[in-house]
Amino acid sequence: MRQPSKKLPETLQVIAQSFPSGTRVCLLFQDEGRFGRIGDARSCWAPLPLRPTVGSQLVREYVYAYVAVSPADGQMSSMILPWVDTRLMSVFLAQTAAQFRNEHCVMLLDGAGWHKAHELTVPINMKLLPLPPYSPDLNPAEHVWEYIRENDIRNPIFSDLDQAMDTVETSLHRLHESPEVLRSMTAFPWIFEPAA
């Protein structure tokens, strides 16, 4: 697995020093995932000689799940919203800041345009730090989508967008209630290595 720049620990130390002393600093990784009604066929096991078949649909309706994950303790903030843009990203950041209101958060995120827009409202207890370009493998939050697709949205046929949204919401709620599962997916060793 690729590792981020060796400057990350030093960068985090500098950011932590900018926060008031005595406050806990929380490291979060953020990402968005798209879920909808287009079929996503997945493999499955079946006894011989059976050969399972899976239905498919091509309805282009989507919702977007926003998550911010704390690999250190398995805590997560999430929202399901109709699209991705600067305004809704600001809403998500405000919710995350409220959830982690007793901490100062450093949030690592990818380089999506709505993450860098001048109109983005970043809460006072939060600093945003971009991940290197073209490096989804460095973002532990990506594993949340993999988990949801493998465990809850295998070969789906949704009758409407609300059914897809309910399935994603149930899966996110289960992850909220299972910090150890979330931690096991997101606690990459390089995150906790001290600065050399």
Model-derived features: positions:
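Short catalytic/ligand-binding loop motif for oxyanion handling, primarily in non-cytosolic enzymes
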Residues: 36-38, 115-117, 137-140
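RNase H-like two-metal-ion nuclease catalytic core shared by retroviral integrases
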Residues: 1-2, 109-111, 129-153, 161-164
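Short, aromatic/basic amphipathic alpha-helical patches
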Residues: 117-125
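A generic structural signal for alpha->beta connector loops
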Residues: 24, 104, 125-128
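RNase H-like polynucleotidyl transferase catalytic core
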Residues: 50-59, 124-143, 157
